[in-house]
Amino acid sequence: MNPYSAGPVQLLGADDPLARSVPFIWANSPSPYGPVALGIAAVISIITNDSIVAAVILHRITSLLGVVAAGWAITALAKRCRFHPATALWLGILNPLTILHLIGGIHNESLMLGFVLVGMELVLRGIDKLEASTSLSMSTAWPGWLLTFLGGTLISAAGMVKVTGFIGLGFAGMALARFLFRRTSMKQWLSISAAAGYFLSVLILSIGAFTLASGIGLGWVTGQGGAATIRSWLSVSTDVGVASGFMGMMLGLGDHTEAILSVTRAAGVLAAAAFMVRMLFATFRGVMHPIGGLGVSTLILVILFPVVHPWYILWAIFPLAAWANRWFFRYAVVIYSAVMSFVVLPRGLGLPPGTIAQIYLSAALGLGTLMIIGWVALRLMRGRVLN
Protein backbone atom coordinates (compact mmCIF):
# COMPACT_ATOMS: atom_id res chain seq x y z
CA MET A 1 0.00 0.00 0.00
CA ASN A 2 1.42 3.36 -1.07
CA PRO A 3 0.27 6.12 1.34
CA TYR A 4 1.26 8.77 -1.21
CA SER A 5 -0.95 7.48 -4.03
CA ALA A 6 -4.37 8.31 -2.57
CA GLY A 7 -6.27 9.14 0.61
CA PRO A 8 -7.48 6.75 3.34
CA VAL A 9 -10.93 6.36 1.79
CA GLN A 10 -9.53 5.33 -1.60
CA LEU A 11 -6.93 3.01 -0.12
CA LEU A 12 -9.05 1.32 2.57
CA GLY A 13 -12.57 1.82 1.30
CA ALA A 14 -15.35 3.99 2.64
CA ASP A 15 -16.67 1.21 4.90
CA ASP A 16 -13.36 0.58 6.65
CA PRO A 17 -13.54 1.62 10.34
CA LEU A 18 -10.06 3.13 10.19
CA ALA A 19 -10.95 5.23 7.15
CA ARG A 20 -14.18 6.39 8.78
CA SER A 21 -12.25 7.62 11.82
CA VAL A 22 -10.31 10.09 9.65
CA PRO A 23 -11.75 13.65 9.61
CA PHE A 24 -13.55 14.43 6.37
CA ILE A 25 -11.13 17.17 5.28
CA TRP A 26 -8.26 14.62 5.22
CA ALA A 27 -10.20 11.55 4.08
CA ASN A 28 -9.23 11.93 0.42
CA SER A 29 -5.77 13.47 0.85
CA PRO A 30 -2.55 11.47 0.34
CA SER A 31 -0.18 11.48 3.30
CA PRO A 32 2.18 14.49 3.42
CA TYR A 33 4.37 12.88 6.08
CA GLY A 34 7.80 11.38 5.61
CA PRO A 35 9.14 7.87 6.27
CA VAL A 36 9.91 8.50 9.95
CA ALA A 37 6.32 9.45 10.82
CA LEU A 38 4.81 6.72 8.66
CA GLY A 39 7.37 4.18 9.85
CA ILE A 40 6.38 4.79 13.47
CA ALA A 41 2.71 4.59 12.49
CA ALA A 42 3.39 1.31 10.67
CA VAL A 43 5.01 -0.22 13.76
CA ILE A 44 2.04 0.84 15.88
CA SER A 45 -0.33 -0.61 13.28
CA ILE A 46 1.52 -3.94 13.34
CA ILE A 47 1.33 -4.06 17.14
CA THR A 48 -2.33 -3.05 17.48
CA ASN A 49 -3.72 -4.54 14.23
CA ASP A 50 -7.18 -2.93 13.74
CA SER A 51 -7.75 -1.90 17.36
CA ILE A 52 -8.39 1.83 17.20
CA VAL A 53 -8.31 2.28 20.99
CA ALA A 54 -4.94 0.55 21.38
CA ALA A 55 -3.53 2.47 18.41
CA VAL A 56 -4.68 5.79 19.85
CA ILE A 57 -3.04 4.96 23.18
CA LEU A 58 0.29 4.06 21.56
CA HIS A 59 0.20 7.11 19.30
CA ARG A 60 -0.49 9.30 22.33
CA ILE A 61 2.41 7.71 24.22
CA THR A 62 4.62 8.41 21.20
CA SER A 63 3.49 12.03 21.14
CA LEU A 64 4.14 12.30 24.87
CA LEU A 65 7.68 10.98 24.39
CA GLY A 66 8.25 13.58 21.67
CA VAL A 67 7.09 16.35 23.98
CA VAL A 68 9.30 15.03 26.80
CA ALA A 69 12.30 15.04 24.45
CA ALA A 70 11.45 18.59 23.41
CA GLY A 71 11.20 19.57 27.08
CA TRP A 72 14.69 18.22 27.78
CA ALA A 73 16.05 20.12 24.80
CA ILE A 74 14.26 23.36 25.73
CA THR A 75 15.76 23.16 29.23
CA ALA A 76 19.27 22.64 27.87
CA LEU A 77 18.89 25.33 25.19
CA ALA A 78 17.47 27.83 27.71
CA LYS A 79 20.53 27.35 29.92
CA ARG A 80 22.71 27.81 26.84
CA CYS A 81 20.90 31.07 26.03
CA ARG A 82 21.05 32.21 29.69
CA PHE A 83 17.30 32.09 30.07
CA HIS A 84 15.19 30.65 32.90
CA PRO A 85 14.45 26.97 32.07
CA ALA A 86 11.27 27.02 34.18
CA THR A 87 9.86 29.95 32.20
CA ALA A 88 10.84 28.30 28.93
CA LEU A 89 9.09 25.07 29.90
CA TRP A 90 6.02 26.99 31.02
CA LEU A 91 5.77 28.80 27.68
CA GLY A 92 6.42 25.72 25.57
CA ILE A 93 5.73 22.37 27.20
CA LEU A 94 3.00 23.51 29.61
CA ASN A 95 1.34 25.58 26.90
CA PRO A 96 -2.34 24.55 26.62
CA LEU A 97 -1.91 24.18 22.85
CA THR A 98 0.78 21.58 23.51
CA ILE A 99 -1.45 19.62 25.87
CA LEU A 100 -4.60 19.90 23.75
CA HIS A 101 -3.14 19.41 20.28
CA LEU A 102 0.28 17.75 20.41
CA ILE A 103 -0.74 15.25 23.09
CA GLY A 104 -4.53 15.31 22.96
CA GLY A 105 -4.76 15.68 19.19
CA ILE A 106 -1.70 13.43 18.57
CA HIS A 107 -0.31 15.71 15.89
CA ASN A 108 3.06 14.85 14.38
CA GLU A 109 4.52 18.18 15.49
CA SER A 110 5.32 16.51 18.81
CA LEU A 111 7.77 14.17 17.07
CA MET A 112 9.09 16.84 14.72
CA LEU A 113 9.80 19.34 17.49
CA GLY A 114 11.33 16.69 19.72
CA PHE A 115 13.72 15.58 16.98
CA VAL A 116 14.70 19.05 15.79
CA LEU A 117 15.31 20.57 19.23
CA VAL A 118 17.29 17.61 20.56
CA GLY A 119 19.22 17.63 17.28
CA MET A 120 20.04 21.34 17.62
CA GLU A 121 21.27 20.85 21.18
CA LEU A 122 23.50 17.94 20.11
CA VAL A 123 24.95 19.96 17.23
CA LEU A 124 25.73 22.90 19.53
CA ARG A 125 27.30 20.55 22.07
CA GLY A 126 29.39 19.05 19.30
CA ILE A 127 30.59 22.50 18.25
CA ASP A 128 31.49 23.24 21.89
CA LYS A 129 33.62 20.09 21.96
CA LEU A 130 35.26 21.02 18.65
CA GLU A 131 36.13 24.45 20.07
CA ALA A 132 37.75 22.80 23.08
CA SER A 133 39.71 20.35 20.92
CA THR A 134 43.31 21.12 19.98
CA SER A 135 42.80 19.71 16.49
CA LEU A 136 39.84 19.18 14.17
CA SER A 137 41.11 15.83 12.92
CA MET A 138 38.84 12.84 13.39
CA SER A 139 41.39 11.10 15.60
CA THR A 140 41.31 13.80 18.27
CA ALA A 141 38.01 15.62 17.73
CA TRP A 142 35.79 12.61 17.02
CA PRO A 143 33.42 13.23 19.99
CA GLY A 144 32.52 16.64 18.60
CA TRP A 145 32.05 15.39 15.05
CA LEU A 146 29.99 12.47 16.33
CA LEU A 147 27.64 14.81 18.20
CA THR A 148 27.21 17.04 15.15
CA PHE A 149 26.50 13.96 13.02
CA LEU A 150 23.94 12.62 15.49
CA GLY A 151 22.34 16.04 15.80
CA GLY A 152 22.14 16.40 12.03
CA THR A 153 20.59 12.94 11.80
CA LEU A 154 17.90 13.85 14.33
CA ILE A 155 17.12 17.11 12.53
CA SER A 156 16.89 15.15 9.28
CA ALA A 157 14.51 12.75 11.02
CA ALA A 158 12.41 15.76 12.04
CA GLY A 159 12.18 16.76 8.38
CA MET A 160 11.11 13.24 7.54
CA VAL A 161 8.21 13.69 9.93
CA LYS A 162 7.19 17.07 8.47
CA VAL A 163 9.34 18.89 5.93
CA THR A 164 9.44 22.08 8.02
CA GLY A 165 11.82 20.22 10.33
CA PHE A 166 14.55 20.56 7.69
CA ILE A 167 14.79 24.27 8.52
CA GLY A 168 16.85 23.33 11.56
CA LEU A 169 19.61 21.96 9.32
CA GLY A 170 20.19 25.43 7.90
CA PHE A 171 20.80 27.01 11.30
CA ALA A 172 22.87 24.06 12.51
CA GLY A 173 24.94 24.45 9.36
CA MET A 174 25.45 28.17 9.90
CA ALA A 175 26.53 27.55 13.49
CA LEU A 176 29.14 25.08 12.22
CA ALA A 177 30.17 27.45 9.41
CA ARG A 178 30.74 30.26 11.91
CA PHE A 179 32.93 27.96 13.99
CA LEU A 180 34.96 26.88 10.94
CA PHE A 181 35.43 30.49 9.84
CA ARG A 182 36.66 31.58 13.27
CA ARG A 183 38.79 28.50 13.94
CA THR A 184 40.42 27.93 10.55
CA SER A 185 41.78 30.08 7.75
CA MET A 186 38.74 29.40 5.56
CA LYS A 187 37.06 32.31 3.84
CA GLN A 188 33.42 32.98 4.59
CA TRP A 189 32.01 31.38 1.44
CA LEU A 190 34.28 28.35 1.87
CA SER A 191 33.29 27.77 5.50
CA ILE A 192 29.60 28.04 4.58
CA SER A 193 30.11 25.63 1.68
CA ALA A 194 31.98 23.16 3.88
CA ALA A 195 29.27 23.19 6.56
CA ALA A 196 26.54 22.92 3.92
CA GLY A 197 28.30 19.96 2.31
CA TYR A 198 28.72 18.26 5.67
CA PHE A 199 25.07 18.49 6.67
CA LEU A 200 23.92 17.73 3.12
CA SER A 201 25.86 14.47 3.36
CA VAL A 202 24.22 13.75 6.72
CA LEU A 203 20.82 14.50 5.18
CA ILE A 204 21.35 12.19 2.19
CA LEU A 205 22.60 9.36 4.40
CA SER A 206 19.67 9.83 6.79
CA ILE A 207 17.08 9.83 4.02
CA GLY A 208 18.60 6.70 2.51
CA ALA A 209 18.75 4.90 5.85
CA PHE A 210 15.21 5.76 6.95
CA THR A 211 13.80 5.02 3.50
CA LEU A 212 15.39 1.57 3.43
CA ALA A 213 14.40 0.83 7.04
CA SER A 214 10.78 1.84 6.56
CA GLY A 215 10.34 0.54 3.03
CA ILE A 216 8.48 3.77 2.19
CA GLY A 217 9.34 5.57 -1.04
CA LEU A 218 10.06 9.21 -1.74
CA GLY A 219 6.47 10.17 -2.46
CA TRP A 220 6.55 12.57 0.48
CA VAL A 221 9.00 14.77 -1.45
CA THR A 222 6.53 15.47 -4.26
CA GLY A 223 3.37 14.99 -2.19
CA GLN A 224 3.56 18.31 -0.35
CA GLY A 225 0.93 20.96 -0.90
CA GLY A 226 -2.22 18.87 -0.58
CA ALA A 227 -3.23 20.77 2.54
CA ALA A 228 -3.17 24.03 0.54
CA THR A 229 -6.61 23.18 -0.81
CA ILE A 230 -7.96 24.25 2.60
CA ARG A 231 -8.63 27.93 3.23
CA SER A 232 -7.30 28.75 6.68
CA TRP A 233 -8.41 32.03 8.24
CA LEU A 234 -5.24 32.13 10.34
CA SER A 235 -3.09 32.41 7.19
CA VAL A 236 -2.32 36.02 6.26
CA SER A 237 -1.56 35.16 2.63
CA THR A 238 -4.83 33.24 2.34
CA ASP A 239 -6.81 36.06 3.98
CA VAL A 240 -5.36 38.59 1.53
CA GLY A 241 -6.19 36.35 -1.41
CA VAL A 242 -9.75 35.66 -0.28
CA ALA A 243 -10.38 39.34 0.51
CA SER A 244 -9.03 40.37 -2.90
CA GLY A 245 -11.21 37.79 -4.63
CA PHE A 246 -14.26 39.02 -2.73
CA MET A 247 -13.54 42.61 -3.71
CA GLY A 248 -13.25 41.51 -7.33
CA MET A 249 -16.66 39.87 -7.17
CA MET A 250 -18.17 42.97 -5.55
CA LEU A 251 -16.78 45.06 -8.42
CA GLY A 252 -18.30 42.70 -10.97
CA LEU A 253 -14.97 41.33 -12.20
CA GLY A 254 -15.89 37.69 -11.57
CA ASP A 255 -14.63 35.10 -9.10
CA HIS A 256 -10.85 34.90 -9.48
CA THR A 257 -10.19 33.88 -5.88
CA GLU A 258 -8.29 30.68 -6.71
CA ALA A 259 -5.97 32.48 -9.13
CA ILE A 260 -5.36 35.27 -6.63
CA LEU A 261 -4.70 32.73 -3.86
CA SER A 262 -1.98 31.07 -5.93
CA VAL A 263 -0.25 34.45 -6.22
CA THR A 264 -0.65 35.61 -2.61
CA ARG A 265 0.37 32.25 -1.17
CA ALA A 266 3.44 32.03 -3.40
CA ALA A 267 4.37 35.59 -2.45
CA GLY A 268 4.00 34.72 1.23
CA VAL A 269 6.26 31.68 0.96
CA LEU A 270 8.88 33.65 -1.01
CA ALA A 271 8.83 36.45 1.57
CA ALA A 272 9.26 33.92 4.39
CA ALA A 273 12.14 32.28 2.50
CA ALA A 274 13.86 35.63 1.98
CA PHE A 275 13.55 36.45 5.67
CA MET A 276 14.91 33.00 6.53
CA VAL A 277 18.00 33.61 4.38
CA ARG A 278 18.55 36.86 6.25
CA MET A 279 18.34 35.05 9.59
CA LEU A 280 20.77 32.39 8.36
CA PHE A 281 23.42 34.99 7.57
CA ALA A 282 22.68 36.79 10.84
CA THR A 283 23.43 33.49 12.57
CA PHE A 284 26.69 33.18 10.65
CA ARG A 285 27.73 36.69 11.66
CA GLY A 286 26.94 35.95 15.31
CA VAL A 287 24.19 38.58 15.46
CA MET A 288 21.53 35.92 16.04
CA HIS A 289 21.75 32.76 18.13
CA PRO A 290 20.97 29.64 16.05
CA ILE A 291 17.94 28.86 18.21
CA GLY A 292 16.70 32.43 17.99
CA GLY A 293 17.17 32.44 14.23
CA LEU A 294 15.29 29.16 13.93
CA GLY A 295 12.42 30.42 16.08
CA VAL A 296 12.03 33.82 14.41
CA SER A 297 12.27 32.33 10.91
CA THR A 298 9.69 29.71 11.73
CA LEU A 299 7.40 32.36 13.22
CA ILE A 300 7.45 34.37 9.99
CA LEU A 301 6.92 31.17 8.00
CA VAL A 302 3.86 30.26 10.07
CA ILE A 303 2.38 33.75 9.67
CA LEU A 304 2.82 33.67 5.87
CA PHE A 305 2.19 29.93 5.37
CA PRO A 306 -0.64 29.04 2.94
CA VAL A 307 -2.39 26.92 5.59
CA VAL A 308 -2.16 27.61 9.33
CA HIS A 309 -3.70 25.56 12.12
CA PRO A 310 -3.66 26.88 15.72
CA TRP A 311 -0.92 24.47 16.82
CA TYR A 312 1.44 25.45 13.96
CA ILE A 313 2.59 28.40 16.06
CA LEU A 314 4.26 25.83 18.33
CA TRP A 315 6.86 25.38 15.57
CA ALA A 316 8.10 28.81 16.64
CA ILE A 317 7.10 28.91 20.31
CA PHE A 318 9.20 25.88 21.28
CA PRO A 319 12.58 27.25 20.08
CA LEU A 320 11.70 30.84 21.00
CA ALA A 321 10.73 29.75 24.53
CA ALA A 322 14.39 28.91 25.12
CA TRP A 323 15.70 32.18 23.68
CA ALA A 324 13.21 35.07 23.68
CA ASN A 325 13.24 36.91 27.00
CA ARG A 326 11.12 39.93 26.09
CA TRP A 327 7.91 40.41 28.06
CA PHE A 328 6.04 41.14 24.83
CA PHE A 329 6.76 37.62 23.56
CA ARG A 330 5.53 36.03 26.78
CA TYR A 331 2.26 37.98 26.84
CA ALA A 332 1.67 37.35 23.13
CA VAL A 333 2.15 33.60 23.62
CA VAL A 334 -0.17 33.55 26.63
CA ILE A 335 -2.95 35.51 24.89
CA TYR A 336 -2.77 33.55 21.62
CA SER A 337 -2.63 30.18 23.38
CA ALA A 338 -5.51 31.03 25.71
CA VAL A 339 -7.77 32.19 22.88
CA MET A 340 -6.96 29.34 20.50
CA SER A 341 -7.48 26.76 23.21
CA PHE A 342 -11.19 27.61 23.16
CA VAL A 343 -11.62 27.97 19.40
CA VAL A 344 -10.42 24.75 17.76
CA LEU A 345 -10.85 21.15 18.87
CA PRO A 346 -7.77 18.92 19.35
CA ARG A 347 -8.60 17.09 16.10
CA GLY A 348 -8.24 20.38 14.24
CA LEU A 349 -11.90 21.13 13.54
CA GLY A 350 -14.02 23.96 14.88
CA LEU A 351 -17.53 23.78 16.28
CA PRO A 352 -20.53 25.78 15.03
CA PRO A 353 -20.84 29.13 16.86
CA GLY A 354 -24.18 28.13 18.38
CA THR A 355 -22.68 24.96 19.82
CA ILE A 356 -19.74 26.88 21.29
CA ALA A 357 -22.09 29.43 22.88
CA GLN A 358 -24.23 26.63 24.31
CA ILE A 359 -21.21 24.86 25.80
CA TYR A 360 -19.81 27.99 27.45
CA LEU A 361 -23.23 29.11 28.66
CA SER A 362 -23.88 25.70 30.19
CA ALA A 363 -20.46 25.72 31.82
CA ALA A 364 -21.06 29.22 33.22
CA LEU A 365 -24.48 28.24 34.57
CA GLY A 366 -23.08 25.07 36.09
CA LEU A 367 -20.20 26.94 37.72
CA GLY A 368 -22.56 29.63 38.99
CA THR A 369 -24.90 27.02 40.47
CA LEU A 370 -22.02 25.29 42.25
CA MET A 371 -20.77 28.60 43.63
CA ILE A 372 -24.24 29.46 44.97
CA ILE A 373 -24.60 26.02 46.57
CA GLY A 374 -21.15 26.34 48.10
CA TRP A 375 -21.89 29.83 49.40
CA VAL A 376 -25.21 28.72 50.97
CA ALA A 377 -23.56 25.66 52.53
CA LEU A 378 -20.76 27.83 53.94
CA ARG A 379 -23.28 30.24 55.45
CA LEU A 380 -25.20 27.40 57.09
CA MET A 381 -22.01 25.90 58.52
CA ARG A 382 -20.94 29.26 59.93
CA GLY A 383 -24.36 29.72 61.53
CA ARG A 384 -24.15 26.34 63.26
CA VAL A 385 -20.64 27.03 64.55
CA LEU A 386 -21.73 30.38 66.01
CA ASN A 387 -24.78 28.84 67.68
Kindly label every feature range from the protein language model.
Residues 1-60:
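Intramembrane catalytic core of multi-pass membrane enzymes that act on lipidic substrates
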Residues 64-65, 77, 81, 85-127, ...:
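Membrane-embedded helix bundles of polyisoprenyl
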Residues 51, 63, 71, 80, ...:
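Aromatic/glycine/proline-enriched transmembrane-helix motif characteristic
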Residues 37, 41-45, 59-73, 112-115, ...:
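Transmembrane alpha-helices of multi-pass, membrane-embedded glycan-processing enzymes
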Residues 233, 324-387:
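Aromatic-enriched
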Residues 168-204:
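Perimembrane helix-loop-helix junctions
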Residues 99-103, 137-172, 296-303:
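Membrane-interface alpha helices of multi-pass inner-membrane proteins
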Residues 109, 113-115, 164-178, 312-315:
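Transmembrane-embedded, aromatic-rich helix segments that form part
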